[in-house]
Amino acid sequence: GFVPEGRRLFPKLTVTENLLLGAFRPTARSAIARNMDFCFETFPRLKERAKQLAGSMSGGEQQMLALGRALMSAPRILLIDEPSVGLAPLLVARTIDKIKELKEGYNLSVLMAEQNFTQAIRIADRGYVIVHGKIAFEGESAEALNNNELIREFYLGA
């Protein structure tokens, strides 16, 4: 499943219609219904807003919808590009927590590009820090979190 930067929803379609667009793999209607139920269980707010136009939702709700749409194809891998873009700090933490829950609870592999290092690395098994187009760090997430020099250089340019 793919969650693009900026969410890339269809603003004039409803939540349900956007979710159905994620069910692009040929599959039985019963599987699509199960996947829809899974999305609504995972993101109860989407069920409340099922008939609402995607373009009228908040940024956090739109991010939930983008994640839900990616889950509609029952993927084994989620590719997520900048999930925190345009979200308030509290929503960033909630979004990252939800990605972690999906990763661990449903055995999904997640490949995520994210500029918010501290949020991304706390759910990662491995991390890569790219500075000016070159890999500045590659390793286990615990190693990255304990590398004060890396963090100082990455955040402060020191």
What are these language model-derived features?
Residues A70-L71:
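ABC ATPase C-loop
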Residues L53-M57:
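Conserved ABC ATPase signature
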Residues M112-Q115:
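H-loop/switch region of ABC-family ATPase nucleotide-binding domains
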Residues L78-E82:
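Catalytic Walker B motif of ABC-type/P-loop ATPase nucleotide-binding domains
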